[in-house]
């Protein structure tokens, strides 16, 4: 992989599947871009690459240049809007049937990932986020070893560990934190996803599971707790259909009114799933202010 022009690499890890690792990667990428940084996302989750779907670029065609595979541009930098560029590369682009999980056995998988890591050309990138397969298997260890070998000293900034309130109660997330210690990867912090539910009718956030476990666990391990993220069905609508999130009158996040103004544009063109508009639509999501804070904390952890 040509990493020469990448400033910082951040891994996104989870001890088990389905906790929202790819959603967190996507939202970190959008928030970093909204903060003006140039961002790359590399999806090596062989268990079912979901990143192309999340960015609305499932049908994108990857091309090859002399320097390697060229990542897909979700949007270019727009300095007048303070937005940085966003590019994505996924193993999913190379699978014959998009969205399939890879069924190869260990050594073939590892060889594929190794080659994939070497063959992608990244242009000027402030943050490269890597969405990894869930778990702490041998496959993970070899992925981490490969990365550590390829990155220059200090380039691999660390890992963001994603969990859910239920997963905290299991051993998986602790295993993930132990995995980081074993592989010498610094933990930048823990995100607790799906810690509550944003009601689509009144936008009240209700804690459906016992929340707070992520923070206790982060304290136990002496790592930073980055924050809690509720389930917002409007985020799912944005990802699945490309529709701009809308909220009833009076909806606030941290005291800020995020309700959809009367007469806001919902034209056909606006509704169309189009990766280049995603970042601007995401700005209207109730999760965006939460991720803006998480992202600021990740940046400060990277720079420490
Ligand atoms: N906070 C959230 N609000 C609304 N939907 C969410 C949230 N977090 C995750 N989801 C949705 O839950 C589903 C699973 O999330 P995601 O694919 O990010 O999990 P994952 O941990 O990456 O899974 P896998 O292990 O299969 O890769 C997705 O449809 C995603 O959009
Ligand atoms: S206030 Fe909201 S969450 Fe509670 S019952 Fe009414 S609509 Fe549902």
From Swiss-Prot:
The gene is cfd1. [4Fe-4S] cluster binds at residues 199, 202. SUPFAM superfamilies: P-loop containing nucleoside triphosphate hydrolases. Heterotetramer of 2 NBP35 and 2 CFD1 chains. Belongs to the Mrp/NBP35 ATP-binding proteins family. NUBP2/CFD1 subfamily. It comes from the Eukaryota. Its cofactor is [4Fe-4S] cluster. One of its GO terms (cellular component) is cytosolic [4Fe-4S] assembly scaffold complex. Binds 4 [4Fe-4S] clusters per heterotetramer. Contains two stable clusters in the N-termini of NBP35 and two labile, bridging clusters between subunits of the NBP35-CFD1 heterotetramer. The keyword Metal-binding applies. ATP binds at residues 15-22. GO terms for molecular function: 4 iron, 4 sulfur cluster binding; ATP binding; ATP hydrolysis activity; ATP-dependent FeS chaperone activity; iron-sulfur cluster binding; metal ion binding. It comes from Neurospora crassa (strain ATCC 24698 / 74-OR23-1A / CBS 708.71 / DSM 1257 / FGSC 987). This is Cytosolic Fe-S cluster assembly factor cfd1. Residues 249-271 are annotated as: Disordered. Keywords: 4Fe-4S, ATP-binding, Cytoplasm, Iron, Iron-sulfur, Metal-binding, Nucleotide-binding.
């Amino acid at each position: 992989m040509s990493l020469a022009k990448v400033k910082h690499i951040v891994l996104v890890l989870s001890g088990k599947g389905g906790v929202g690792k790819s959603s967190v990667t996507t939202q970190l990428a959008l928030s970093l871009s909204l903060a003006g940084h140039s961002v790359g996302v590399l999806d090596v989750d062989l268990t079912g690459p979901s990143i192309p779907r999340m960015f609305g670029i499932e049908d994108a065609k990857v091309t090859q240049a002399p320097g390697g595979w060229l990542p897909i541009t979700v949007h270019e930098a727009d300095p007048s809007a303070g937005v940085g560029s966003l590019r994505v590369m996924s193993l999913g682009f190379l699978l014959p049937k998009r969205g399939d999980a890879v069924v190869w056995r260990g050594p073939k998988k590892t060889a594929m990932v190794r080659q994939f890591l070497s063959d992608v050309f990244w242009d000027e990138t402030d943050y490269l986020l890597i969405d990894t397969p869930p778990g702490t298997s041998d496959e993970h260890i070899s992925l981490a070893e490969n990365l550590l070998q390829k990155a220059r000293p200090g380039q691999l900034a660390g890992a963001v560990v994603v969990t859910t309130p239920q997963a905290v109660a299991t051993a998986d997330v602790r295993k993930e934190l132990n995995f980081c210690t074993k592989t010498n990867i610094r933990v930048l912090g823990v995100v607790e996803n799906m810690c509550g539910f944003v009601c689509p009718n009144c936008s009240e956030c209700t804690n459906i599971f016992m929340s707070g476990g992520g923070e206790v666990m982060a304290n136990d391990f002496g790592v930073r707790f980055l924050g809690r993220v509720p389930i917002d069905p409007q985020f799912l609508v944005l990802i699945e259909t490309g529709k701009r999130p809308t909220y009833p009158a009076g909806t606030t996040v941290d005291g800020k009114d995020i309700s959809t103004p009367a007469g806001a544009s919902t034209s056909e063109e606006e509704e169309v799933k189009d990766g280049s508009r995603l970042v601007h639509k995401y700005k209207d999501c109730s999760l965006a202010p939460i991720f803006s804070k998480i992202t600021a904390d990740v940046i400060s952890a990277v720079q420490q």
